[in-house]
């Protein structure tokens, strides 16, 4: 774990294909940013992120594809886990397991097992369960729904410290009700963070990735600064241009430099992707066959 010093709240959504992760992300973000159509196949193919300002906090939401879609390979899974790690650095405050109202399926059990295998069981201290299709409770209280749930579902709820809530992402649900749901989720996460001594989730993978990102940002910043100084020098030494032309060109060069610096984090993320992928691949390739057969090996 690592202490959180800023006002950001990093939220990673995980769960099986079709559980409503993208629709939930849109509800949290307060607008339709991610494609959340009802489809037979996964709509979200790649890990994606977006953020919003909310009551003085910056909510960063990372939407992941179904990590255990049976059609996907180890290679694809490693790529998406790598993207998730990079997108949520230096570490998520909450790993939100998105489930449809109903039973706790094998694919969802495998997703939790995968999280434990990659990040360790301590990741469960940062997990919240979010049920979608709240409107289908049809008068039944959420408390009663949990009380009547099967053993598997009760077990994962207990393992997550009974941190759970329900969302209705339906277009029929009012904006005010959706914002109330976001309020409930954020309060649940903030309470969890307090229980974790103000810390977000972090481990060796996240720490190493964040360090690589910072180092790469420094290298890129120096490269761009040196390039800018060299280009400015060439402009200043150009005897065929007036002072007014030089000033205008230098101004444009600085604007171009500022744009590069603004996007330096994203470029650093692209640069280190292969290193993170190789680490995840090495870790999972040794145990992948076990996930494809018995997830219980990791769920215990």
Swiss-Prot record:
InterPro entries: G_AIG1, GIMA/IAN/Toc, P-loop_NTPase. Keywords: Cytoplasm, Endoplasmic reticulum, Golgi apparatus, GTP-binding, Lipid droplet, Nucleotide-binding. It is found in: Lipid droplet; Cytoplasm; Endoplasmic reticulum; Golgi apparatus. Its main location: other. Most abundantly expressed in spleen, lymph nodes, and fetal kidney, but also present in the heart and the small intestine. Lower expression levels are found in lung, kidney, liver, and thyroid, salivary, and mammary glands. Also detected in the thymus. Detected in T-cells. Monomer in the presence of bound GDP and in the absence of bound nucleotide. Homodimer in the presence of bound GTP. Heterodimer with GIMAP2. The dimer has GTPase activity; the active site contains residues from both subunits. This is GTPase IMAP family member 7. The gene is GIMAP7.
